[in-house]
């Protein structure tokens, strides 16, 4: 957490507030016409030697994993009706030399809604996957509804954190943009209505390690991405993360803190001074709320704050309420 604070330029106890302020004062991304670092080397699916297993050094983390996983890919797509774009992080498994499976949690993520709508239109959904970007983009991409509703581009949160817009570049093989300073970019299309079994190559029954610390079950309802191209920097650096780790706790937990703080502050201004998504809950299951009571009638409002947090975040299981003199 101290390293994240140093990377984002604030104190570790103020990370949630920093992200909350960034979400309230977004700076939209821009499309640049300069030569993008992520396109220094280009591989097209039509190349004779094109093979994702060789081009992307994605790790297989455990003996029972469904395959090599991309876990730090910034998935960027645009809604086919509104033209509004979104970035999120999803687990993706390399299934063949030109195919990825992508797990989109039903009903909870924007790109899932975009893929559903594209399927209704019987059209593929163009998607870029940018790997190896700066920390502001990675943390900003982990925001979820209700703080960032459908149509809210989380790259604008990263822009606010960086105090400068995120630069995008047009993809070379699909009608979509990618993050210009990425190490790798995978360009492809989510196939309309096509679902695949995540462990179709291994048949282990598992996907990969999840954030609570156990191996997650393989999904039978993963969407299929047909890859069109891979671009990367000269001598690119691959970035990855697995679920049970302090790195994942920060990626998931700090945006959760910001979202809870933002929601409660709207309903009960000034009554909650800070929020901490404790590592014991993986950044999702447990939150500590630091409450401020100025008059005797404030007693009870801390319970209202807890109920607000529970109502907004279905994954939340425990909320601990403390006074403002407790160091969280």
Segments from the language model and where they lie:
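Extended, highly charged
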Residues: 1-224, 228-328
């Amino acid at each position: 957490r101290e390293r994240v604070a140093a990377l984002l330029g604030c104190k570790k106890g103020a990370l949630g507030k920093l992200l909350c302020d960034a979400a309230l004062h977004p700076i939209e991304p821009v499309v640049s016409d300069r030569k993008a670092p992520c396109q220094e080397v280009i591989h097209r699916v039509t190349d004779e030697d094109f093979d994702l297993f060789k081009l992307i050094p994605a790790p297989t983390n455990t003996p029972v994993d469904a395959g090599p996983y991309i876990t730090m890919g910034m998935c960027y797509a645009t809604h086919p009706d509104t033209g509004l774009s979104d970035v999120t992080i999803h687990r993706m498994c390399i299934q063949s030399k030109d195919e990825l499976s992508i797990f989109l949690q039903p009903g909870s993520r924007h790109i899932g809604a975009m893929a559903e709508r594209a399927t209704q239109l019987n059209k593929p959904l163009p998607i870029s996957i940018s790997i190896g970007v700066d920390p502001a983009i990675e943390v900003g991409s982990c925001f979820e509804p209700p703080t960032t509703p459908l149509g809210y581009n989380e790259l604008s949160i990263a822009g606010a954190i960086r105090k400068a817009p995120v630069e995008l570049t047009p993809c070379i093989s699909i009608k979509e943009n990618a993050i210009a300073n990425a190490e790798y970019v995978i360009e492809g299309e989510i196939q309309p209505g096509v679902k695949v079994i995540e462990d179709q190559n291994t048949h282990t029954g598992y996907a990969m390690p999840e954030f609570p610390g156990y191996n997650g079950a393989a999904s039978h309802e993963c969407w299929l991405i047909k890859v069109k191209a891979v671009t990367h920097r000269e001598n690119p650096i691959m970035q990855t993360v697995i679920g049970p780790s302090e790195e994942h706790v920060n990626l998931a937990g700090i945006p959760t803190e910001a979202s809870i703080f933002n929601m409660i502050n709207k309903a009960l201004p000034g009554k909650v001074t800070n929020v901490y998504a404790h590592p014991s809950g993986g950044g999702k299951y447990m939150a500590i709320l630091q409450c401020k009571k100025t008059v005797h009638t404030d007693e009870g409002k801390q319970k209202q704050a807890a109920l607000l947090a529970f109502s907004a975040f279905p994954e939340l299981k425990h909320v601990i309420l403390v006074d403002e003199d407790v160091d969280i």
